[in-house]
């Protein structure tokens, strides 16, 4: 199956729509533009982001964002154009995480608090992907996003322990999953049951995975995916988060 790449400007337009609703105001981070050659792009708003009454930047950092079938996770971070492969400067990035980090950079100066809220930002974004190669690239992009933003802010590389902490969060929040089954891809199997009659004749009976047979995500015999509930500091099955369980 071929990978489908959503152009970065479409990702930006859709994320802008989400932020327009959250802020109650349009085009706070950037505005869509059409270049002379007909290419659709965006122009970054360089002014500090202002928050509406009743909300603040910490609320924005904590707000959960989730990219399904994320591929290389262009909605989470936009280090490069999805169709051009051109590197995008930090100030012009448009992903969910990019915007959260921008807000942190605008409101935090001290390293300790920057790391604290950056960790929270990483814990607030989620994504799953069927294909392992795309998942690897997505995780890599998120980790590089942390390193690049840290260097941009403090003009030095982050400590290994800080990189490892973010890498651990990424390993939980971006995972490999069959989104229709909520299990690790291709982990469901048919079982063989052998029955023997009184004459010692044996018959092999193939038993299908009931979840696959009945298209019920709660009945699969594959390996169910787990994610981390960071507030409770415990793991939970992703399938248990679905509504109307068992219906």
Q: What is each PLM-predicted segment?
A:
Residues 1-13, 17-26:
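A short N-terminal interaction module
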Residues 14, 175-180, 214, 219-222:
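C-terminal intrinsically disordered extensions
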Residues 22-182:
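Conserved S-adenosyl-L-methionine
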Residues 70, 188, 209-212:
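Disulfide-bonded cysteines in secreted/extracellular proteins and peptides
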Residues 182-198:
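Short, surface-exposed amphipathic charged segments that create phosphate/polyanion-binding patches used
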Residues 194-247:
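Long, low-complexity, polar/charged, intrinsically disordered or flexibly structured peripheral segments
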């Amino acid at each position: 199956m071929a990978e489908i790449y959503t152009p970065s400007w479409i990702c930006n337009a859709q994320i802008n729509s989400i932020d327009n609703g959250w802020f109650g105001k349009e085009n706070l981070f950037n505005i869509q533009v059409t270049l002379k050659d007909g290419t659709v792009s965006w122009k970054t708003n360089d002014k500090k982001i202002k928050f509406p009454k009743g909300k603040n930047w910490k609320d924005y950092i904590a707000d959960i964002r989730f990219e399904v079938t994320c591929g290389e996770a262009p909605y989470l971070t936009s280090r490069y154009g999805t169709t051009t492969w051109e590197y995008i400067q930090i100030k012009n990035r448009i992903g969910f995480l990019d915007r959260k980090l921008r807000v942190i950079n605008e409101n935090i100066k001290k390293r300790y608090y920057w790391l604290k809220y950056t960790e929270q930002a990483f814990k607030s974004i989620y994504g799953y992907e069927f294909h392992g190669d795309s998942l690897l690239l997505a995780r890599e992009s998120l980790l590089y996003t942390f390193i690049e933003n840290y260097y941009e802010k403090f003009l030095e590389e982050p400590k290994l322990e800080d990189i490892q902490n973010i890498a651990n969060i990424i390993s939980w929040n971006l995972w490999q999953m069959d989104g229709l089954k909520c299990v690790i891809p291709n982990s469901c199997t048919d079982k063989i049951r052998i029955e023997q009659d009184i004459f010692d004749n044996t018959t092999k009976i193939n038993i299908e995975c009931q979840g696959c047979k009945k298209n019920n995500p709660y009945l699969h015999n594959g390996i169910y995916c787990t994610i981390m509930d960071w507030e409770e500091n415990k793991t939970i099955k992703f399938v248990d988060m679905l509504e109307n369980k068992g219906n």
